[in-house]
Amino acid sequence: MTSTRGEAAGIPSVSLNDGHSIPVLGLGVGELSEAEAERSVAAALEAGYRLIDTAAVYGNEAAVGRAVNASGIPREEIYVTTKLAVADQGFGTSQDAARASLERLGLDYVDLYLIHWPAGDHGKYIDSWGGLMKAKQDGVARSIGVCNFNAEHLSNIIDLSFFTPAINQIELHPLLNQAELREVNAGYGIVTEAYGPLGVGRLLDHAAVTGVAQAHGKTPAQVLLRWSIQLGNVVIARSANPDRITSNLEVFDFELTDDEMATLNGLDEGTRFRPDPETYTGP
């Protein structure tokens, strides 16, 4: 299944296990102020992005919604993701939180609603998954999924609910390439979505990355995004800089060789720059 979303910028889409599809590259707005988020989303949509990723805990859903609604782009062409905060986990509270997110966004539905963190409480995230299933049934969210879930978290919710997430969004970059978890996701038919694809900037001057960039006449950031896309991931790239937002789109006119992919894959050392999902408990 393909989508018109992102076609203007040449962004392909991938099919989800529920029949919907999602662009393979999007803009993230984590840690951006409301003003920064509104400007960034407006710039991204103008540049051709059609996937925007926010969360309740980011505190900028309203700004994202303003930019989406002011863009003049038909709503069905924009893919909006938001996430359930740890504090709102639970069967009923997750549904209330989803509707509160819609109100802040000023939208009738979100394309994707995610549990932001498992947060260590087995019962809570399972109850929350039931709440997300109800939110999907009620039309609040077109697709539902999870973030930061490991193999055990996934099996817990799937075995108990008989319903599989569409997406698992995880920290993923060459220093943490998540090969085993990507394989688990694929086994369930779950699309892997990568956040932190630049390794919080730590990889931009790595010799292996800059060498590949020079070979293609591309920036290190473009190489890192291309690497993740070639692995089969959907990629969320955060930026408040309009020039970088545009530059990050220029990843569909070249391809990394098998040797270059192997070089970047070989950088994996299990390094996290974001919290460990097995120990993180909020917010």
Swiss-Prot record:
Binding residues for NADPH: 196, 198, 200, 236, 238-240, 244, 247-248, 274
Alphabetically ordered keywords of this record: NADP, Oxidoreductase
One MF annotation (Gene Ontology) recorded for this entry: aldo-keto reductase (NADPH) activity
Active-site residues, record numbering mapped to chain: 58
EC code(s) of this entry: 1.1.1.-
Pfam families linked: Aldo_ket_red (PF00248)
Top EC class of this enzyme: oxidoreductase
Family from the record: Belongs to the aldo/keto reductase family.
Stated name of the protein: Aldo-keto reductase Mkms_1984
Organism listed in the record: Mycobacterium sp. (strain KMS)
Lineage: Bacteria, Bacillati, Actinomycetota, Actinomycetes, Mycobacteriales
